[in-house]
Amino acid sequence: MSLQSYDKEIFDLVNLELKRQCDHLEMIASENFTYPEVMEVMGSILTNKYAEGYPGKRYYGGCEYVDGIEQLAIDRCKQLFGCEFANVQPNSGSQANQGVYGALLNPGDKILGMDLSHGGHLTHGAKVSSSGKIYESFFYGVELDGRINYERILDIAKIVKPKMIVCGASAYTREIEFDKFRAIADEVGALLFADVAHIAGLVVAGEHQNPFPHCDVVSSTTHKTLRGPRGGIIMTNNEEYAKKINASIFPGIQGGPLVHVIAAKAVGFKHNLSPEWKIYAKQVKANAKKLSEILISRGFDLVSGGTDNHLILMSFLNREFSGKDADIALGNAGITVNKNTVPGEKRSPFVTSGIRVGSPALTARGMKEAEFEIIANKIADVLSDINNTDLQEKIKAELKELAHKFIIYDRATF
């Protein structure tokens, strides 16, 4: 029986979401459009199989084929990042980070990560996260120019003396210099852990500095710029750390892995290893650069004055409207972004003074600089007359027409 026949309520909602994804311009920096092949294997019979343990060391029988699947995912992941060991079982980036901490830290150990309000992530020590409750967390941030000051981080690290330094961000527009973080970690005797969830797709294409060999451990998600399924991975070159990480994931924080998702990760990695991937990653950066150039030319302030990667941060500290206002207005015009805090933030995190805008999803649809120039100007038009709902409706219709020239899915399920 088809989903439409059995559960029309869910079928209708899923297809409404398909329509939204086709009609709107997805510019949330952490979102992307995955491949049909990835979704096909996620919807396979692999969802039926329990496989507690690791390839060759399972607690269940009948794992001979899923062993092959997981090993393929591991091997492709290692090839992608140029590392010796990889764990592909984490169900998310947050669980990957939790697994790293559990493997290499003891409760109460000090960690030094990027402040959430400066572009870090909840799992980098934020007090509302388990990473900020189990461990003693300290923070570094960006300067008012929106850039990391590595000398300032060294000064903080000398005072804090952390067991681990966490580098990586969810809203940082410039290249992260892992070699400089390595020098800081060495000077204070700290472990160095990189969370490259946002930039992984650029890293594996050679469009961003690789965290290896500089970092002791690296985590990532497999969606975002990698365009794979939703999930996490952990990598290292240290065999002792690898064993501890494996134990920290299973049986530490997870039971049976999601075999259908691990298979989808393997399929995604095959895409990432293809020559076409480098073309995609270059285009992601080129599109973000075009976006930043146009918005600056239209008189808008960008944190750090531009971008080196896949995203920009627009600052409205000198405007009467907030990030929340901009988020809503652009949504009404058919452009999906998210409100975001900015350096020097004066509003609450529920309102903010900025928005985060990314290029990966629209690049996946096939859009290039010409389309991003159009889109950037439409963003500027909306924000220059933010209360003009008639203009928002007009632009929404225009952008829907543009979006329909770049349809990526013709159905909702695979």
Swiss-Prot record:
Pathway: One-carbon metabolism; tetrahydrofolate interconversion; Amino-acid biosynthesis; glycine biosynthesis; glycine from L-serine: step 1/1. Its cofactor is pyridoxal 5'-phosphate. One of its GO terms (cellular component) is cytosol. Keywords: Amino-acid biosynthesis, Cytoplasm, One-carbon metabolism, Pyridoxal phosphate, Transferase. The modification N6-(pyridoxal phosphate)lysine is found at K224. One of its GO terms (biological process) is tetrahydrofolate interconversion. It comes from the Bacteria. Pfam families: SHMT (PF00464). It is an enzyme of class 2 (transferase). Its main location: cytoplasm. It catalyses: (6R)-5,10-methylene-5,6,7,8-tetrahydrofolate + glycine + H2O = (6S)-5,6,7,8-tetrahydrofolate + L-serine. (6S)-5,6,7,8-tetrahydrofolate binds at L116, G120, H121, L122, E240, S348, P349, F350. GO terms for molecular function: glycine hydroxymethyltransferase activity; pyridoxal phosphate binding. It is found in: Cytoplasm. The record marks H223 as: Plays an important role in substrate specificity. Its EC number is 2.1.2.1. InterPro entries: PyrdxlP-dep_Trfase, PyrdxlP-dep_Trfase_major, PyrdxlP-dep_Trfase_small, Ser_HO-MeTrfase, Ser_HO-MeTrfase-like, Ser_HO-MeTrfase_PLP_BS, SHMT-like_dom. PROSITE patterns: SHMT. PANTHER family: SERINE HYDROXYMETHYLTRANSFERASE. Catalyzes the reversible interconversion of serine and glycine with tetrahydrofolate (THF) serving as the one-carbon carrier. This reaction serves as the major source of one-carbon groups required for the biosynthesis of purines, thymidylate, methionine, and other important biomolecules. Also exhibits THF-independent aldolase activity toward beta-hydroxyamino acids, producing glycine and aldehydes, via a retro-aldol mechanism. Homodimer. Belongs to the SHMT family. NCBIfam families: PRK00011.1. This is Serine hydroxymethyltransferase.
